[in-house]
């Protein structure tokens, strides 16, 4: 529940609004029972316990990188389904990457998360739990959130928007919108809706190819919203929000790494203030795809920068603990 919804629920019980704030604060400190909320009267705690339950995911598996301390969680949800989240440590703070769905309907060829398709969309509380319990279990204060785990966040638009409202609340975890990144494979209608909300988060668009022919081969979504249609929506988003878009670009040998594609990408992103985040392909056996060579990646980056487009190579974290999103869930469920 949002704080406003919780206040309405307490008003219906004849309780003052400040009681809702107390419960909201308890929940965001990780309370897993109403009995633990000691600043509430016992009768109120009993009433709440009879009307509601507090959900808590359990750790099905946890991996800690020996290389950099990255922590990968596989959470078992109330219905037995599993999702992943990853805690990454940086000099500027700790970031958690969370999932938005169980499985994914988008079918991107290079991604393990989409194998098996969509099972269901996560509730706002299940999104929040990944942040909260990753923080509590790891002991690391979370300052940044990226919605780049399993699932397509904009396919779960309403629940993700409710989650953002809750996690941004000053009475809860109070994580600022500018510390939140949301990734999409390019659902144009939802990008347009997101622009109208002007949330000041960072939008990351999984582009992965600048031309329709190669992008359609690896990303089925391109058949509905081709590259130029997607980039037009991105330009409108930038104009309305003033927020620079980060374009995710997986470097795939023979698919998306040619000098000609680098030139085309630079041309199509001109004037957008865009940033390209180049990502070496993580191995997904079923895809039959391979990452680009270091030489090809350096050449691609140089061409972008020579044409006025900023580009960085994503730092690889947790490479020894199933770094590819969706891999841990697949291995766990296949055993």
Where are the regions a protein language model picked out?
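Auxiliary Fe-S-binding modules of radical SAM enzymes
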Residues: 1-81, 235-244, 249-335
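A generic beta-sheet turn/junction motif
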Residues: 66, 78, 89-91, 186, ...
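Canonical Radical SAM [4Fe-4S] cluster-binding loop centered on the CxxxCxxC motif
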Residues: 89-126
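Short linear Ser/Thr-Pro motifs
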Residues: 65, 99-100, 113, 183, ...
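A short loop-to-beta-strand scaffold at the N-terminal edge of the catalytic core in hydrolase folds
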Residues: 82-87
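Conserved alpha-helical substructure of the radical SAM core
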Residues: 114-144
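Conserved AdoMet/S-adenosylmethionine-binding subsite of the radical SAM
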Residues: 135-312
């Amino acid at each position: 529940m949002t704080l406003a919804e919780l206040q309405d629920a307490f008003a219906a019980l004849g309780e003052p609004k400040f009681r809702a704030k107390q419960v909201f604060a308890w929940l965001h400190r990780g309370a897993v029972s109403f009995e633990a909320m000691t600043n509430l009267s016992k009768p109120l705690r009993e009433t709440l316990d009879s009307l509601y339950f507090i959900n808590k995911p359990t750790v099905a598996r946890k991996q800690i990188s020996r290389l950099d301390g990255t922590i990968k969680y596989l959470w078992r949800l109330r219905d037995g389904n599993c999702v992943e989240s990853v805690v990454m440590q940086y000099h500027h703070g700790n970031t958690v990457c969370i999932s938005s769905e169980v499985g994914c309907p988008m079918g991107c060829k290079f991604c393990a998360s989409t194998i098996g398709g969509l099972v269901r969309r996560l509730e706002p509380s299940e999104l929040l739990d990944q942040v909260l319990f990753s923080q509590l279990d790891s002991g690391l204060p979370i300052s940044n959130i990226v919605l780049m785990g399993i699932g397509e966040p904009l396919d779960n638009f309403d629940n993700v928007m409710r989650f953002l409202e809750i996690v941004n609340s000053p009475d809860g975890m109070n994580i600022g919108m500018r510390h939140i990144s949301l990734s999409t494979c390019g659902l144009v209608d939802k990008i347009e809706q997101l622009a109208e909300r002007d949330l000041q988060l960072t939008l990351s668009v999984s582009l992965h190819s600048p031309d329709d022919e190669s992008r359609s081969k690896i990303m089925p979504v391109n058949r509905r919203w081709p590259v130029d249609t997607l980039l037009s929506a991105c330009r409108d988003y930038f104009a309305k929000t003033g927020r620079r878009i980060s374009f995710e670009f997986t470097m795939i040998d023979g698919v998306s790494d040619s000098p000609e594609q680098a030139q085309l990408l630079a041309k199509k992103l001109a004037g957008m203030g865009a940033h390209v985040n180049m990502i070496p392909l993580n191995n997904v056996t079923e895809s039959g795809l391979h990452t680009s060579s270091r030489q090809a990646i350096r050449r691609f980056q140089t061409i972008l920068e020579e044409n006025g487009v900023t580009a960085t190579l994503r730092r690889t974290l947790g490479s020894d603990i199933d770094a590819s999103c969706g891999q841990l869930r697949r291995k766990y469920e296949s055993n």
